[in-house]
């Protein structure tokens, strides 16, 4: 693929894609994070300060605020940098960002991994089932595979509703899936924005009209609407991926405890779905409070991740 096969969006938090500079962006998670004013100090000396890069994707918002809640309880000062995908990798490689929690491998961020992978620390994968999808409402009983779209363009108005034009999801759909299934001359891939795609999807569902959209898992909309991903017998949308956490050079040396916790960090699809629903769906504008609420509802979770280091952490109040 020619670029990272991913996309930006922010549902229910009201934001646009962040700019291509390490500046605060317009995403709901950003309201609680500051901007780092200098290098973070490690666990062994001075104040414990850490800067986490945040892309406005649901799973990243959810897990970033999860760790913000935990680390603040452990005495860290947590700064959140709202960034786009290219600068989050460059910033981590350069040491301006300490931690980024949403690296999709091997395909979605493959281009960036080829460029920066030897300049950052891979801290491990926390989810193994991430995927890119073409998706329709479940009431479309006669469309179950991408193959079923062929010959039905009139039904869909000749459109596949996509997201941002530079996104990897759009590129995968346009460069791989549409040619593989012979849809190029029959359908137009509409490129707009993720919020616009979601609005069209919800409008179509209210009216029970046909629609096919580009989507991805994990995503909060699967918990909100009755959807089905189209089968992809040719594998054009790519194989399932792993979501990794990465750290700046020297991260494990400077933050040995945190590196161990991050290495133990795992979330199932069910867990990330419930975390997203709480953090984004129920606590818009107060995402860290949402993370605390989720931790209060899952009191044993941190014991699995942090072991004895979880003692004394109480989010029930």
Task: Go through each PLM region and give its residues.
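Short, low-complexity, disordered segments immediately C-terminal to signal peptides
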Residues: 27-48
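Short helix-initiation/N-cap motifs at beta->coil->alpha
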Residues: 57-58, 79-91, 188-200
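A conserved helix-loop-strand patch within extracytoplasmic ligand-binding domains
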Residues: 118-166
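A bilobed periplasmic-binding-protein/Venus flytrap-type ligand-binding module shared by bacterial periplasmic
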Residues: 131-141, 241-256, 277-278
């Amino acid at each position: 693929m020619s670029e990272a096969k991913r996309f930006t969006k922010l549902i229910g938090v009201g934001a646009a894609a962040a700019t291509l500079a390490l500046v605060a962006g317009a995403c709901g998670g950003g309201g609680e994070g500051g901007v780092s004013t200098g290098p973070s100090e490690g666990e062994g000396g001075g104040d414990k300060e850490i800067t986490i890069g945040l892309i406005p994707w649901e799973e990243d918002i959810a897990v970033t605020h999860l760790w913000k809640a935990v680390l603040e309880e452990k005495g860290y000062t947590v700064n959140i940098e709202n960034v786009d995908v290219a600068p989050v990798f460059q910033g981590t490689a350069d040491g301006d960002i300490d931690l980024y929690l949403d690296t999709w491998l091997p395909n979605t961020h493959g281009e960036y991994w080829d460029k920066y992978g030897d300049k950052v620390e891979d801290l491990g994968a926390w989810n193994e089932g991430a995927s890119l999808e073409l998706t329709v409402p479940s009431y479309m009983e006669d469309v179950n595979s991408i193959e079923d779209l062929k010959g039905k363009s009139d039904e869909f108005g000749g459109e596949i509703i996509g997201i941002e034009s530079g996104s990897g999801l759009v590129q995968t759909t346009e460069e791989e899936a549409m040619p593989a299934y012979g849809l190029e001359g029959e359908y137009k891939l509409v490129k707009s924005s993720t919020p616009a795609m979601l609005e069209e999807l919800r409008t179509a569902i209210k009216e029970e009209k046909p629609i096919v959209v580009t989507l991805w898992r994990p995503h909060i909309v699967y918990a909100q609407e009755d959807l089905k991903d189209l089968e992809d017998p040719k594998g054009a949308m790519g194989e399932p991926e792993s979501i990794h956490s990465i750290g700046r050079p020297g991260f494990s040396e400077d933050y040995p405890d945190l590196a161990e916790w991050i290495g133990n960090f795992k979330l199932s699809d069910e867990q990330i779905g419930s975390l997203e629903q709480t953090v984004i769906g129920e606590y818009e504008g107060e995402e860290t409070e949402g993370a605390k609420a989720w931790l209060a509802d899952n009191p044993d979770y941190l014991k699995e991740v942090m072991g004895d280091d979880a003692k004394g952490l109480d989010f029930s109040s």
